[in-house]
Amino acid sequence: MNRRDVFYNLERRVTPTRLLNSIAQSFNNPMNDGKTLVLVEGYGDYRYYKKMLIEKSVFIQSTSGCDNMNAILPILVKQQKCLAIQDSDFLKMGQHKIVSANMLYTDYHDYEMSALADDDFRKRYLEVLKDNGCDVDINIALTELYTLSYYKLCNELHNFRTDFEPVNKLICKVEKLDYNMIHGHIGSNSNGFYDITFGFLNGIIRSCPIDEDKKEYHLVNGHDLFNRLCFHSGGVVDEDFLRDKLLELSELSDFMKMNLYT
């Protein structure tokens, strides 16, 4: 189990009430006078934005997921200066997201994809990976994740409650990520599971065009991309290594190019 999965399992136990109590205890003290409370989704986001934002001006708090963030933001904005940074996910492809002056969204699917969408940063990143024995092609990995990512988009748009965990575990292991492979391994975490047929999925693909530059960076999430790059590395690197290198190479000058910064 990688570091991200460990923190994900811990974060699943966090509730909005516990989170509000924790914030009240940690943020409301004289050391944070004048600071803006900034909510981020998870541990990886916390590490990234802690490096990018001026610590003396902000107090960054992980909310252990977007559902908790959505629940507590309306309460917190009434009490103190508060902003939230949330993954845009499929926002550019029709997914409904909260509209609020206090809610900011990543330029692309998440912070990882927003960083890698920049040509200069992506070139530096791939060069460092190559120096560490991981000579991979991001474009190939993105293309291979196309069907799975549209499957996930379909699930979000229609709330089909599909459990992708069995497939997610195979992204770094299997040669093909086609419809048959995906459909054969997905499960359901509720009785409301809907069987997404091949024809239905193709209908979603046709009906959800995105007139955006680098649309694949809106469609694919960073977790899946890193796992696919692990597959193409032949086991040379793992997801934690890829994530750590992205954080290590990210500079304020990179962050300042993003619409999120402005």
Predicted region positions:
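Acidic, divalent-metal-binding catalytic cores of TOPRIM
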Residues: 1-262
